[in-house]
Every structure is written in C-alpha cells, then in structure tokens.
Amino acid sequence: MDITVILCTYNRCQSLAKALESLAAQTLPSAVEWEVLVVDNNSKDQTRTVAEDYSRRHPGRFRYLFEPQPGKSHALNAGIRDSHGDIIAFIDDDATAEPTWLQNLTSGLHGNEWAGAGGRIVPAKNISFPRWFPPDEPRLFRTLALFSCGLEPGPLTEPPLGTNMAFRKEMFDRYGGFRTDLGPCPGSEIRGEDTEFGGRILAAGARMRYEPAAIVLHPVSPDRLRKQYFLTWWFDKGRSEFRQFGIPRDATWFVAGVPLSLFRRLARWTLLWILSISPARRFSCRLKVWTLAGQIVESYRHGHSRETVTAS
C-alpha cells in the first residue's frame, strides 16, 4: 500500500460525510494504492453509520476503526498502528480536500529526500476579518486552522497543521507518535499535538516540504472571529507550550513554583498592551499576555517538574 489517509473524528457525522465525499473524489494515478482510514474516537452520533456506508460504497478504499480511549492523539496513534500505507496523510473531519490534494501533498514523499509535507489550508468561504485582527501576523491565522506559506513550493521551516500534512510512515517508527498529553479531548482543548510532532522531526534534522498546490478547505464559523475565541485559544496555546517545553533550564528564581521570568514577561507585555494605540497591535499584545498566563497556570500546576510526557 502506498498511502493511508487518516481522518480522526468525534461527534461530527454531518461534516464527516462532506469530508469523506471529498476524499472519494481524489484523482490519483491508477497505479497508486491508497486507502482512507476513519478513526472514530468514541462518537455518540451517527459517525459509524456514515463511515461504514462509505466502506460499502467504496470497498477496499475506506476502512473504519473504533478507538475508545478519549483524545485525538490516542486516535491518531491508533490510526498509525493500523495503517497500511508507506506514506500517511492527515485531514480533519470538518475539512474538505480539493480533488488533487492527496496527489500534490504526497508526490515528493516516495523517495528519501523529504520526511513529510504540508499544504495550504484556506477558508471554505470568503470571510471579513474584524478591525482588531492583525492581518500582518500570519501566525494568528493558525488560530482559525488556516495555513499558508505563499504560492511557491519549498522547504518548510515551521511545522504544518494537522488538517493538511503527510509523513513517511517510518518517521513515526523513528521519532515516536503523537504526544497523548497534547491534543483535544473531552473536557480539554489543549492542542498542539500536530505541530509538536512536526517540530520534533524538524529539530532532529528531518526535512519537510511545503506543497501550496495541496489545498484543503476549512470552515471558519462566526464564533471563531470573536475576541473571546482567540483569547481562549491562545491561553490554551500557552498551556500547550509549557507541556511541550517545560521550565526553561536557565530558570533559577521561582514564585509558587512558577519561573519569575514568566511574571516579568507578563508585566512587560501587559504594559505594551495598555500603551498600544492601534487596535490590531493592542490585540496582538493582549494575545501574548493570555499565552503567558496559560504558561503560568500550567507551570503552577506542574510545580518544578521538568519531566516530559513521551509519545505512545
């Protein structure tokens, strides 16, 4: 088997059907053997019915796997273990892929030059950004699960997002799977399992390629264009960053188990937030404050521990 597409899902049977329909419409050379593995992370809706319907309609192309352990990373790792492909691609259950997505995303991974690849994630519909949104800060688009490094292919210097990425399967054998202390699960929206893995292999010297022609469409609901959504997302991002990187090794002074340097940075960015005149600049500084607050909260919960939770 050449390629396995892993799609993890939880209680999104309606958007799942649209995602699977876009995968059924993929155009790859007839010589390429590929499959879609739907990993159901203990859904309570009609997810299994939808997935098994596609298995019946496209025998040999779609498979269904039930993973009872809550948490997206558990579902991802279960899918990797059950996959048949030498290349593993990932897409989310609320996204749709353009017909040439899989071919463009994986075309450079059949040799040994590239360990993985990532493509563009664009809004499914045109959206109007509010005045407070900083349009010149590409990193903020990640909050909306959007990703672009331009229109030219080339090496990636930052990890792609999980709804449009692929890796040679041997990368998981070499570097481990997705960390199970990261990623959405019931009761927690701490993300980062996708970018942590991509960052892990980039830090190890592996090379990843940006494929702008590999396009995934992702919905951006009005709720995600509200300040509170961004603030919550960046607070959770701070918590995720602390789980990934822990306490800085040069930290020497602590207050209630939290590095004093985090409080200093929090004070500095709070001052910048207060003094900024531009609405976009003010909000950008405010997001940094919320990120640092998330790091402080997570640091307080973990005390002085520098232990890293390994991938399973």
Placement of each model-derived feature along the sequence:
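Conserved donor NDP-sugar-binding/catalytic core segment of glycosyltransferases
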Residues: T100-F133
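Acidic donor-binding loop at a coil-to-helix junction in glycosyltransferase catalytic cores
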Residues: P160, P184-F197
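A conserved acidic beta->alpha catalytic loop
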Residues: S22, D40-T49, A95
